[in-house]
Structure formats: structure tokens, C-alpha cells
Amino acid sequence: MHVDIGAALASAADPGVERATLDDLDEQVAVAHERIEQGRNKGEFGYASLNLLEATDAETIHDAVAPVADAESVITVGIGGSALGAKTITEALAEDPGSHVVLDNVDPEHVRRTLDGLSLADTAINVVSRSGTTAETLANFLVVREAYEDRGVDWTERIVVTTGESGPLRALADQHDLPTLPVPEGVPGRFSALSAVGLVPPAILGIDIEGLLAGGQQAADDLAPSLYDSPAYAYGAMAYALEEAGATVNAVMPYAERLESFGEWFAQLWAESLGKDGRGQTPARALGATDQHSQLQLYRAGHRDKVVTFVRPRERADVSIPDPDHEDLSYLAGTDLGGLIDAEYEATVASLPAADRPALEVEIDRLDAESVGELLYAMEAACVLVGELADVETFTQPAVEWGKNATRALIRGEATDETAVIDERERLRIGETESL
């Protein structure tokens, strides 16, 4: 993996990072790296995320999924970090893009349509919740379990559970003697893609989880006390410096359909980790080349508050374009889709500094297990670095907890400080049939 920061320098873009300040930034990286390494060595909460590879045993995961290894598809019941890592990996690497479906929302229509479209006898259940009490996850699991029972499928023979040492989900797993894997200690869910939390569906679908871990290890080995020597830290340092310069939106734009969910995973990682104390880049999601025809207009000509992060594989499978039968399409003769998307990538990246707007480029070798594992670990490390540079509590999410507490209180009919805010919030409804 390599990172190109040239289009984010002040000589190319505004906002941008002055080349003369890179050495000062590098000194900050060295200090932050030392603090990160101290946290890793002590196994401190959150910093233990970067030690996850050492604690993840692929053989244990293979053993747990063995009873469902014949499944043709997997349904993951989880939310946030309990689902997005697995979704990103399987979308990037599974032979059948529809073989992994995710229930990470409680929209009843979506849940119903998803279950109606599956052959449950051929589908494994992967349920993930650290606490075992996550409302959305447990509600969806109960619905899924009933669907299996209604179709005469023994759900206890088609399930793998990943959860903590206590809680209702752990009790259920113990009661039915279900295959169970632990959620790693000291690791927030959004940093757990390269653990059982993210690796169960790939393992069931025959994806090379050892390769994913090896790729993550490569990114770990590349961490160094200098942005000039570490692609992950180069990305994190530049993202931090660009936010300081005014780029408060980070639009992630992969040029590979199979990396579309990577943008979703990155959005949670970046927003939940760094959105603290009135700061943090807002992650946006785009897809190349599709969004050249929509969002690119904003990125080149809208507010100067954005950096676009381009992600692409250097090598990719190809499809030849048949010779056209119209002279206006003759420029496509002898070309292929890979050449076309690469040309669009180069043109779009160049279009941003041409409009005096910043861009960062992340290039992986190819869409294989090693490269995807390397990308995920590198972005996690970059996020940890940004948190250190910005001096925020990277591994907590207090603003998220407010909504969780309020939801539970509403469901239980309890009166709490949160429900009082809900009851008293100002409303001005337009379109009401009764007079305001």
C-alpha cells in the first residue's frame, strides 16, 4: 500500500499543507507514535486495537464456523462495528456478492424483504453483540430466529455467536450449546474488523482470513515514528493537518465497486472516533467513477472545506470493450473497462488540484485478502494517530450513548432526563392538517 500526499500540499490546493511545515508535522507524528506504542505495550483500552492481530487465532475461528461451513450464504445480525467490518471484507472478497447479507437496521420492510429472499436452510446466522443487549441486534435476532422456526429450520444448527462473557446473548448461547467466539477485550467495535467480530462471515464463505491477518500485520510492521516511513501515518497526519487548515469534510471515493462498503466502514471509524470536543472531519461517501457525474461538481466548485480521499487497487481483473460500430465511439476501440476506469481515476484526481482543491491517494496492490487486511489496519492506525494529534478521546463515544439510553427508556416507558428532552423539544411541523 502507498499513499500520495502531493495533491494535498498548499502548492497544489487550498486548503493545503505547506511543504515547509511537513518536518514540524513529522515531529508531532514521532511524539504521537511514542504515546501510541506506550499504550499498545501496556494493553491500554483502545490502544489494544493495534495489538489485535496477535490475539486473533484463525484456527479458533475456523473451528467455530465448521458446523455451518456448508452454508451458501450468511446473514449477519449486528450493528455498527459488529457488522461493517465483515460487510466490507465480504463485499471486497466474496465470489458471490450476494452471499453475505447484513441486518444492521430495524426497518421492518427491509428485514422482511431480506428474510423472504433467503433460503434459510442454506443460510448461516452470524449474530454479534459485545454486551448481548444491543436493542437492534437482539430484536432482529428474535425475528430471524422465528423465521427459521416458521420454515422448519433448526436455527441452533445454523448459527455462530460472537459476544462478551456475560449478558442475555451469552446466556442463550450457553443454554443451547451454540458455537461461540469472544469479542476482544479493550477494543471498541469499530476497530475490531480483524477479529472474530469481522472474520466469521469471511471464514464461512471460504475467504482467506489468514491472508487478511497477514495483510494487517504488514501494515502494523510499517508503523514508524515518521510520516515519511509509514503510509498509515502519512495519511493520518495529512488528514489532521488538512482539518487544521479548514478541510473539515473527508470524502472517501474508492475506484472499485467492491470497496463501496469500505467507505461506510471508514465513515463510522472516523466519525465515532474523532467527532469530539467540537472537532473532527465529517466523513462523506462517494464511488468512482459513478459519482464523478454528481458529487464531483461539489468537490471542485463548492465550499473549500473538503478533501477527497481516493482509493484504488493497482491491479484488477479486466473486461474487454467490444469494437464499437459507430465512428463517434471509435475512441473505445481496442480498450477495456479497466483502462477506462483508470483513465477516469487519473482525470478525476488531477481535476481537484486543477480547481485548487486537495486530494489524498491511497493505492493497494489488488483486491485480495492481504491488501484488504492491510488497508483496514492502516486506516485504523491512521485514525488512532489523528486522535493523538488532535488530543481527543479516540476510543469513546459518549454522544452515541445518549441516543442508546433514550431509546431504551422510550421502549420501557421510563421517564428519564433523555425522554424529558424528547418530550420538550421544539417542533414546527409544516403540512399538519390542524392549525398550528
Curated annotation (Swiss-Prot):
<dbReference type="InterPro" id="IPR001672">
    <property type="entry name" value="G6P_Isomerase"/>
</dbReference>
<dbReference type="InterPro" id="IPR018189">
    <property type="entry name" value="Phosphoglucose_isomerase_CS"/>
</dbReference>
<protein>
    <recommendedName>
        <fullName>Probable glucose-6-phosphate isomerase</fullName>
        <ecNumber>5.3.1.9</ecNumber>
    </recommendedName>
</protein>
<dbReference type="GO" id="GO:0097367">
    <property type="term" value="F:carbohydrate derivative binding"/>
</dbReference>
<dbReference type="InterPro" id="IPR035482">
    <property type="entry name" value="SIS_PGI_2"/>
</dbReference>
<feature type="active site" description="Proton donor">
    <location>
        <position position="272"/>
    </location>
</feature>
<dbReference type="InterPro" id="IPR046348">
    <property type="entry name" value="SIS_dom_sf"/>
</dbReference>
<dbReference type="GO" id="GO:0005829">
    <property type="term" value="C:cytosol"/>
</dbReference>
<feature type="active site">
    <location>
        <position position="293"/>
    </location>
</feature>
<comment type="pathway">
    <text>Carbohydrate biosynthesis; gluconeogenesis.</text>
</comment>
<keyword id="KW-0963">Cytoplasm</keyword>
<keyword id="KW-0413">Isomerase</keyword>
<comment type="similarity">
    <text>Belongs to the GPI family.</text>
</comment>
<dbReference type="InterPro" id="IPR035476">
    <property type="entry name" value="SIS_PGI_1"/>
</dbReference>
<dbReference type="GO" id="GO:0004347">
    <property type="term" value="F:glucose-6-phosphate isomerase activity"/>
</dbReference>
<dbReference type="GO" id="GO:0006094">
    <property type="term" value="P:gluconeogenesis"/>
</dbReference>
<keyword id="KW-0312">Gluconeogenesis</keyword>
<dbReference type="Pfam" id="PF00342">
    <property type="entry name" value="PGI"/>
</dbReference>
<dbReference type="GO" id="GO:0006096">
    <property type="term" value="P:glycolytic process"/>
</dbReference>
<dbReference type="GO" id="GO:0048029">
    <property type="term" value="F:monosaccharide binding"/>
</dbReference>
<comment type="pathway">
    <text>Carbohydrate degradation; glycolysis; D-glyceraldehyde 3-phosphate and glycerone phosphate from D-glucose: step 2/4.</text>
</comment>
<dbReference type="GO" id="GO:0051156">
    <property type="term" value="P:glucose 6-phosphate metabolic process"/>
</dbReference>
<comment type="function">
    <text>Catalyzes the reversible isomerization of glucose-6-phosphate to fructose-6-phosphate.</text>
</comment>
<feature type="active site">
    <location>
        <position position="404"/>
    </location>
</feature>
<keyword id="KW-0324">Glycolysis</keyword>
